[in-house]
Each structure stands twice: as C-alpha cells, then as structure tokens.
Amino acid sequence: MGTKAKAHIILLPRWFAAPLFGAPIVLGALLAGGMSFTSWIGLLAGLLVMAGGHSLNSALDYAWTGLDRGGGTERSAEKSYTTAQNLIAKGILSVKSVYVNGLCWYLLASIPLVYLALRVGYAVLIVGFAGMSITFLYAKAKFNWTHELVLGLAVGPLAVLSGMYATSGSPPWKSGLLASVPFAIITSFAGLALDEWPDAKANLAKGVKSIAYKVWENGVSLEWYLSSWLLFSYMYQIFLINIGILHPSSAVSFALWPFFIGSMVFLRTHFKKASGAFVAAGIAYVIFIVLGHALG
C-alpha cells in the first residue's frame, strides 16, 4: 500500500479509536434490547461517521484553526498512537484531498443511516447527522471552553443513542444518557488533557481556551488530573450498577486500575510510551464495561 493510500484509508480515520466510539454504540444497542442485525448496521454507520469526523478534523485544524500548521514545534505533535495530524503539514496529503476523504466517509455513513431510518425509525438519522456536525463544532470548541463538552457529547450521549435508535424506535433513552457518562469521561474529560499535553505550548500561542490546555499551562499534575477523572468514572460506574442500568459483571473494568496507575507513574520520564499505554488501558476499559454487561 502506497504512502498516500495508507494515509487516506488507515491514518486519517484514526481506526485505533474505533473501540472508544464503537463500545458506547454497542452498549446502547444492548440497553435497547440486545444486538440485532440493525444494531450491527448502526455500529458500521457510527464508525464511518467517526472516520469522516477524524479526517475532516485534520483538514479543519490545518486550514481553519491553524493548529496543525507551522514548523515542527509550532503545530500539534505526533503521538505514539496517531500521526494523522501532520499529514498535511508534511506535504503527504493536500488540504483538498483530506476534505474529500472526510466527505466520502460521511457519504458512506449516510447509506446505512438511511437504511436504518427506513427500517427502524428516523430518530437514528437525526442522531447520525448530529454526529457528523460534531467535527465542525469540535474544531472551534478548542477556542471557547467547550472542548471537552463537544467531544464528550460525541463519544457519550450521541454514540449510545445511535446504538439505541439503530436497535429500537422507542428505546429507554434516559437510561442511555446516564450510561454514556463513563465513555465521555475516559475519552474526553480525561483523555483530552493527555492528548493535548504535548500540543499545549504551541496551541496556547494560537489562542486555544480549554481545561485540557490549562492543565499544562497552570502546572497542574497531569497524573492527579487523570486519576481524579478515573476515580469519578469508577464511582459513577458503581452508581449505574446499583440502579440497575449496568450489570454487576461490568465491574470487570476495575481490573484495569493498576494498568492506569502504572502508565501514569511513567508519564514524566517516558511520556510517549506511557501515554500510549494509558490510551490502551482506556480502550480496554470501555471494552470491558460493554463485555461485562453483555456477558453478565
């Protein structure tokens, strides 16, 4: 596979994040009655929306917000888990081709979404198109203090609701909203501070405003910040189990606590490897919640 083909098909969509978006979709389907044929179609649609959103975000962060533009230390840094943010700056892809890439993923996602709308109900179409719009809100959210909220909305409520409405025309959506919180916490409220840590100096010079960047700017301990959100997520998970939304078996995710702690211990000395390990633990966390609930 050529460099450009790999960039378009593998790197821009950021498939490593598929579990972070896919797990809440599956949980939504389970809460709405269980996985069915339309649930799997909904999962496919959700992942295609994710791919398009990631691709368009790369173009927007270069051409619109300018965060990925400039020299090596003046733009977003490459991470151990993704290098897609620098494909345009390095001249591997053009801005136009990245826009086209993102729109093609969205066009592909529209096919299963329309099918689900005709088969299950039109609510899934509304949720799906709302998910597509998130990437444009997210690009500017980094400049108006809604950074975590916008991404949290995408990987939390919208993802869970998409799984629900792909499964049933009248799902228990209130339970879905409550169940979506841990997914929003791990990927957005905790994850963004980690993801933006190496970008903070360059992006703050361009005017970004979000809590994730302030963690770095104000010298707040990243380890303390991450562990605080993790502790809240685990406590909230206990709440969901107690009120009967999650099955007690979903507590298998607690087994990952030592891995989170271990990765944070090495953040100061081996940031790139440790951050990759934290992301891997976060991916396992959302998978364990869903698997535990499904098998319980």
Question: Where in this protein do the model-derived segments appear?
Answer:
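Transmembrane alpha-helical segments that form the membrane-embedded catalytic/substrate-channel core
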Residues: 47-61, 132-140, 182-199, 256-267
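Solvent-exposed interhelical
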Residues: 54-106, 186-233
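Extended hydrophobic alpha-helices typical of membrane-associated regions
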Residues: 239-296
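Small-residue-rich segments of transmembrane alpha-helices in multi-pass membrane proteins
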Residues: 19-28, 150-165, 213-217, 275-293
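Topogenic membrane-insertion module of multi-pass membrane proteins
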Residues: 1-60, 70, 130-159, 169
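Helix-coil boundary and interhelical linker segments in multi-pass alpha-helical membrane proteins
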Residues: 26-44, 110-125, 159-181, 235-249, ...
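Functional transmembrane core segments of multi-pass inner-membrane proteins
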Residues: 34, 151-204, 221
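Intramembrane alpha-helical segments
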Residues: 86-170
